[in-house]
Amino acid sequence: MEQNSNSSVADTFAEAPATDADYGTENCSGSGMSVGDTVSANHEFQTMKPGPGVVHKVMPVANSASSATATNGRTRSEMPHSELVKMLYYLEGELQARDVCIAALRNERVKQLIAQLRTKRLQPNDPYAAIFRDKIALNGNLISRESSTQAAQAEMEVRQIIEQQMEQQYQMVSKQRATHVRMVNILTESLENNQRMLQELEEEKRKHENTTAQGDDITYGLELERNKLKQDLEEERAQVAKMEKDLKKLQETLEYERNRQKQIVLLLIAERKKILMKYIEEGKRSEDLAQILAEEKQRSDTIAEGLEEESKKSLRMEEELEKQTHAMEQERKVLFAKLAKEELRVKELEQELNALRSEHEALKKQQQLGGSGSSVAAAKARQFSDDACATPPMVNIAKIVQPTATVSSMPVSGPQTGIARSIAPGQNIRSAGIATAPTGTATAAIAPLTAVLNHTTTITTTTNNTTTSSNSNSSGSIGVAATAAAVAASVETAATVTVPMVAPPSPSPAKMQPTATIQRAPGGKYAALAAAAALDQTTTPHPHPVPIAVPPVTVPPAGARGAPPPIPTKPIVPPKREPSLSRLGSITGSSAIAAATAATTAAGTAKQN
């Protein structure tokens, strides 16, 4: 190691003289000398240039110490103590050998330079000597005066150059001495650092022994922890293996379910296609049904319009029937009043007749006693009594009703209120519109009139109890002709009194109404009227024709509209009706009859009294 360091230093000095100064300067830059330290330049070569020693100030450098500390820290942490001590010894030996080599080379170089200056022997390769020779050659011969002067001047110039070179050499020597001082300081500091490092290493050794003693316990605890962690690791591995098995099973189950779901999806897709096809078919069918429904709705609207017309017609007929019923009720009241008057008159006539009979009996007895001379007068008196006892003839009280409305009813199934109802063929009710009887002189005074009044009352009651309507106009009036009984002015004279009997005019055939065929529901108003008329004919024959006010109904022809289907979506609601006049008339009629009966009874009792 010493030979290598010496050879490297020798090569450096041989290459360039100025390199030593640079090298010394670089080494000085790494020194740790403090500011203000002075180094004396007293040396054995001080005699070369007299004068006081040069004092040099060395600048401190902290980077080297910090880098050395960092390096030592890394080495301390990486290498053992014995190796570090051995390396420190090697470093000290190398540094000492380097210092010896540097001092020897420096002395040798200084001796060579001083010897050259003293002997003035210049080397051929010296640039200054070459310049001097060139100058002499240019100036001429040395013998001449001018050349001698020029030679003297050249010599002076050479001396100046030599002095400059000497000055440079002195400066270089002073720099080398300062470098030497710096290196000595660096070595001193390095020795101090080495001693400090040894102390730290000893302390670290003691600490390491203590740490090792404590580390045994820690190692034992760590060993226990390691065993525990190994057991936990084995358990975790077993659990991981178990979880892997479970995962494999789950993957198999997942694959099975995936295939199953795929099949289900395919089946659902096929089912969806079928449903879509069925949906399309049902859509077409619904469109057809909607079209049919629209047609049926249009047809039902047409039928509803017809039903509305029929309803209006039936309502008009009902109004007319109510008017007719009201008129008949008024007529019934008038007839009851006339009946009461006639009953009073009949009672008066009966009383007079009884009185006349008693007188006649008395006269007859007187005539029998008087003789047969008065036979003619007795015969006349008997004839008068027979004629007087006879009832006055009944007049024609028949009411000729001229119908004004015809109903073309169409059999339609629907609401029953206010709308004509249909019946099956063959259920036509034929009733006699007019009950006829042979005309002639009546034999009873009260019975025909009572029968007519009873018949009228039956018709009125039946009309009040029914709710259907018919269209008819009431025309004409009932003429009641009272038979005037001629009473002789003087019964005592026994004159023949003749009472002419006026035959009532029979109704003309032109005014008689034919029987009407009524196409209505069984149990209706007209059926009740016909039944009442038939019962009246069978029980009490009328001497005069009594027509029933039944309006004829025209039967629809064979080519009329047929029966439409029922209308489930649009039922016709009949309008709300006010209380009919027939109901009000029935109430007022019954009250009027009761009043007339009471008045008749009161008058009869008053006369008897």
Swiss-Prot record:
<dbReference type="GO" id="GO:0030027">
    <property type="term" value="C:lamellipodium"/>
</dbReference>
<dbReference type="GO" id="GO:2000394">
    <property type="term" value="P:positive regulation of lamellipodium morphogenesis"/>
</dbReference>
<feature type="coiled-coil region">
    <location>
        <begin position="182"/>
        <end position="264"/>
    </location>
</feature>
<feature type="region of interest" description="Disordered">
    <location>
        <begin position="556"/>
        <end position="584"/>
    </location>
</feature>
<dbReference type="GO" id="GO:0150012">
    <property type="term" value="P:positive regulation of neuron projection arborization"/>
</dbReference>
<dbReference type="GO" id="GO:0001725">
    <property type="term" value="C:stress fiber"/>
</dbReference>
<dbReference type="Pfam" id="PF09727">
    <property type="entry name" value="CortBP2"/>
</dbReference>
<dbReference type="GO" id="GO:0005737">
    <property type="term" value="C:cytoplasm"/>
</dbReference>
<protein>
    <recommendedName>
        <fullName>CTTNBP2 N-terminal-like protein</fullName>
    </recommendedName>
</protein>
<dbReference type="GO" id="GO:2000601">
    <property type="term" value="P:positive regulation of Arp2/3 complex-mediated actin nucleation"/>
</dbReference>
<comment type="function">
    <text>Regulates lamellipodial actin dynamics in a Cortactin-dependent manner and is therefore likely involved in controlling actin branch density, actin-retrograde flow rates and lamellipodial protrusion. Functions by slowing the dissociation of Cortactin from Arp2/3 nucleated branches thereby increasing branch nucleation and junction stability. Associates with core striatin-interacting phosphatase and kinase (STRIPAK) complex to form CTTNBP2NL-STRIPAK complexes.</text>
</comment>
<dbReference type="GO" id="GO:0090443">
    <property type="term" value="C:FAR/SIN/STRIPAK complex"/>
</dbReference>
<feature type="compositionally biased region" description="Polar residues">
    <location>
        <begin position="1"/>
        <end position="10"/>
    </location>
</feature>
<feature type="coiled-coil region">
    <location>
        <begin position="303"/>
        <end position="370"/>
    </location>
</feature>
<keyword id="KW-0175">Coiled coil</keyword>
<keyword id="KW-0966">Cell projection</keyword>
<keyword id="KW-0597">Phosphoprotein</keyword>
<dbReference type="InterPro" id="IPR050719">
    <property type="entry name" value="Cortactin-Actin_Reg"/>
</dbReference>
<feature type="compositionally biased region" description="Pro residues">
    <location>
        <begin position="563"/>
        <end position="574"/>
    </location>
</feature>
<feature type="region of interest" description="Disordered">
    <location>
        <begin position="1"/>
        <end position="29"/>
    </location>
</feature>
<feature type="modified residue" description="Phosphoserine">
    <location>
        <position position="586"/>
    </location>
</feature>
<keyword id="KW-0963">Cytoplasm</keyword>
<dbReference type="InterPro" id="IPR019131">
    <property type="entry name" value="Cortactin-binding_p2_N"/>
</dbReference>
<dbReference type="GO" id="GO:0061573">
    <property type="term" value="P:actin filament bundle retrograde transport"/>
</dbReference>
<dbReference type="GO" id="GO:1903119">
    <property type="term" value="P:protein localization to actin cytoskeleton"/>
</dbReference>
<keyword id="KW-0206">Cytoskeleton</keyword>
<dbReference type="GO" id="GO:0015629">
    <property type="term" value="C:actin cytoskeleton"/>
</dbReference>
